[in-house]
Amino acid sequence: MKNVRDFGAVGDGITKDTAAVQQAIDQGGTVYFPAGIYLCGSLYLHSHTTLELENGAVILGSPDPEDYNQPDFCPQNSVCLPEKAFGAHLIIALEVNHVVIRGGKIDGNRAAFFDPSLYSRDDFPGWRPSQMLYFCESSNILLENVEMVNSPYWTCFLHGCSDITIRSVNIRNQRGVWNGDGLDIDCCRRVVVSDCIIDSSDDSIAIRASGKDRLLHADGICEDIAVTNCVLRSGQAGVRLGVGNGLIRHCTFSNLVIRDGKFGICMLSTYYPELFPAGAEGAGISDILFSNLHVNAQIPIDISSNWADKPLKTSRKEICGITLQNIRGYGCRTSILQGNQDFNLRDLTFSDISLEITGGEDILNPNHPSVPICYLRPCAFYIAYTADVLFRNCRIRWKDESERWQQAIGTENNRDLVFTDCRFALPRAGNGN
């Protein structure tokens, strides 16, 4: 075991400890951090390396851009100019295996780079790092009992990795931070996330199939993902699936509490192609199971072929083989199932779903500043351009709802849409389903 203090690390939160910590890491094996605040720029992990942080040990991101990697340090890395993220990372694991980070705290020092109350993202004139933890084309990764806080962008990004365990991790990002995701799992295989608490300003957990053209060894498939026993508080989606042009398949999500976001469960094949043209083809999403969830979000469920108010003529990728069961949800805007005109949103089962709908004062408001009109329809659930969809033993109730609501279910151009043993109450102003 190598103690970073034996290599000259001070741990006072003022002295830059990057060189000393990197020297300890370069020795390999277990690197021990006693209590203290270790101010660091980019740290590069090697295979068979463990970072063991004692209680009270903090790796704190340097406020100086020159202490971080260059954006072209590896061909897989990227800069996202629309999101003002410049490709720098605090901890990097590139093409390595058997890496462990355990205990302590990793702090991205977001406040050193920007104050979201002073700028919008589009108006921000400065520089900020990208993902705080960056794992790329690596395998056998364990993240355990570690806090990750104050990331200036996404917190933890796993791209093209395999055999990953994320257990008892606590992620906290300040509300209002642009793109402050929790976990982004992209083109990865065999991932288990369990017993985590994530409080994120953007998506808490995002399953993606993006950037496959940048990967050197992995493909664009994200599969065999299991997420269980987590509490997620989100500014956007509790769980998001989609983004990119690869495939997402064979995923389970169970025993989750999702709170406070715009979306509880969000699946979206094509996402903002005008901003991200590489993903215009869309991600295929199949064989997905959600079970035993408590969801409290503005829009509890959104499964859509594209990010648009209206269906497109064709889809290049399918969303199919989706099951949601044993879910209790609370919302104030319209949940959506919307495919494109080729009915490539198909084979969906909703079983034992209970939704309670409140509010609705902005329903049918085309001037709402931030929510597309498709989420402001006068029904609790809107279903359009789908095929082979079953609702079984589902219930919709109302509480303190606006008179703008008209009905529980709205449908348009569906094939084989079946409801069995369902109870859909009318809102106060409703005139039929």
Label each PLM-derived region with a short phrase.
Residues M1-N433:
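Extracellular/periplasmic carbohydrate-active domains that bind, remodel
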